[in-house]
Amino acid sequence: MSDRYTYRVTWSAEDEEHVGLCLEFPSLSWLAPVPEEAFSGIREVVREALVDMLANNETPPQPLADRAYSGKFVVRIPPETHRDLVIRAAENGVSLNRLVSSLLAD
């Protein structure tokens, strides 16, 4: 199951090593001198955490990839930004929703 989670490897200037991260387990990380070792290290740490959670009857987090998404979310912005976006959408002959969707996709 640990292969279904969302992993990232990035450089840690503070540690001067690559750090492996798992988005669903934000408290876990693994440092290594090369990216491949950081990736395999964090996957092993997550695997061990899952084994431990299941042994203690804890529910592991649902992988981001397995979650259902509605395609809708609410964003609060300043009224001036809202106005500017409406004007920009009108100038482009598209709906506000289409404009914002396009901007977010970039």
Report each predicted region and the residues it spans.
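A short, exposed loop/beta-hairpin motif centered on an aromatic-Gly-Thr core
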Residues: F25-E37
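Short acidic, gly/pro-rich beta-turn/loop elements at beta-sheet edges
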Residues: E17-V19, W30-A32, L85
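Short, charged, surface-exposed hinge/linker loops at domain edges
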Residues: M1-T6, R43-D106
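N-terminal segment of the canonical double-stranded RNA-binding domain
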Residues: M1-L21, F25
